[in-house]
Amino acid sequence: MKKRYSLPIWFITALAIALIVLHIALPGLIRDYLNKQLADMGDYRGHISDIDLALWRGAYQINELTISKVNGKVPVPLLNAPVIDLSVSWRALWKNRSIVAVVEFQRPALTFVDGGNATNSQTGEGVDWRAQLRGLLPIHLNELRVTNGTLAFRNFTVQPPVDLKATNVNAQLQNLSNVTDSSTPRPAKLNATADVLGQAPLMLKAELDPLGNLDDFDLQLRITDIQLKQLNSFTRAYANFDFNKGDADFVMELAARKGQLNGYAKPILRQVDIFDWKQDVANKDKNLIAGLWEAVVGSGGFVLKNQRQDQLASRIEISGDLNAYDISRWQAFKAILRNAFVKAFNSQFDGNKR
């Protein structure tokens, strides 16, 4: 008869106690480690309030991640993420025998601020956020999700303050596990939806390499039914006019190949009314010069628009070399877009004078 072997009861008890102690202590150790990583990010500093472990599903949650600007007077954080959930993809584990993760940002709020100067503005530039994400989530990512997020642009230095928001932001960035495959220049796919200014639906699709240099990508953006009066705080601050009524659609398609960017943007405005004599000139809170300026802007739109449909449409050609600037690809991308829109506006303005 074979002798049966069994583990001593004291060993089982000690192992159980050790696992319980580890389960209790590990979240605090992880939190302290991540906070140390987030404490030194140049102009920005991050903090995590708590970590929750769910070992039974191979997951952990980061609670209340806040990233704020250290210098300057910026009253809101760059990022506030109440919950970040990271879990192992069991499908990939069983199908491909690879350990990859899915990360979900729940109700994140990302806020950019124009403070009038670089010190008091908040753009997120100057930090390699991809490296910070890898530090926060030290596992091979395959998919990144955003659920019920908010994207905002604020300016607290003007009256009325500018507060533009896209709410109900839901996005999926998939196929990140193949970004190291050099044979596929645009391996990841991005799909996103949102409500701009409370009600205008936004749709965004892109194919790109999020860990690359933005040399190769395809992008499609569409926003419909923008109520132009919702933009008045922005137009008042940056162009000194108001919309009395009107709605708009905006479409943009861009493609980059080896750093060469090409595409177009097409704003379509309908039933636009910018100048109203009773509201703008007779309004005691506005001076005569401001009212006359809005009249000029409004008449310019009237000349350009389709008389039968009361519609103003324009196609703005966008092109440029992302490698031609001694700055980051993202900064070059913004500069090319800015130059295209400024050029289009100047061309239309000059055309109206003829």
Where are the predicted features?
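Secondary-structure transition motifs
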Residues: 64-173, 271-299, 313, 320-349
